[in-house]
Amino acid sequence: MDKLGGFIGNFNSFISIDLRRSKNFIMIRYALFFLIIFNISHAVEFQGDFKQGSFILGKTDPKSKVFIDNRKIRVSKDGFFAFGLDRDRKNNVIIKIQNKKETKLIEKQVFKREYKIQRIDGLPPKKVTPPPEVYERIKKDNKLIGDARAINSNLIFFKDKFVYPIDKYIITGVYGSQRILNGKPRRPHYGIDFHAPEGTPVKSMMDGVVTLVEKDMYFTGGTVIFDHGHGISTLYMHMKDINVQKGQK
């Protein structure tokens, strides 16, 4: 889907954008920096903020292999790779760049991020503590989302700039915040909530391929997932109408 050429659908009352990289949660930031590490054989570039919950974009020799904490990740034909830092990560991240000539280890400190406490009251009790009769539905929804998020394609849209999905908005929920729903603490929020009038068009945050379209999930309502390549995906939730189909670019 071209982020400027079409719309995913329309708002209900708000939309929650969930940005994730495999099992590591990420937050897309617009104020980015480059760190370039040179040696005799090649240079390694990093774009991003090495803080808890951040998204890191890297570039190296396309023939190199890249490992993050000993886990091999994809490297594109032009040398791009990407990974996320967990919300609560406490250890430094070890990046291994390996080619035929040498193996280079890079250790980067991961800085702590302060998270907000968000209280939301007045929610329907069944949305805070679901009744037993919907457990199977929730389990099915979670599997559909998990399968879509697990896709690790060779697309390289992730290296382009992310944009917000709507032009005029109010942010009502931020990544990493601890939510207390109807007085009950819940797991941290792994997305961004936008409030806008009902019917507001929603666009993809960057080019990608639609991997999930569901009109009525229990927790997330109208839900769409885009694959941007290398395990990077964006999720669009709580939409009233959906105007894309699975497999659409």
What are these regions (language model features)?
Residues 30-39, 95:
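Sec-dependent N-terminal signal peptides
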Residues 244-249:
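Beta-rich strand-turn-strand
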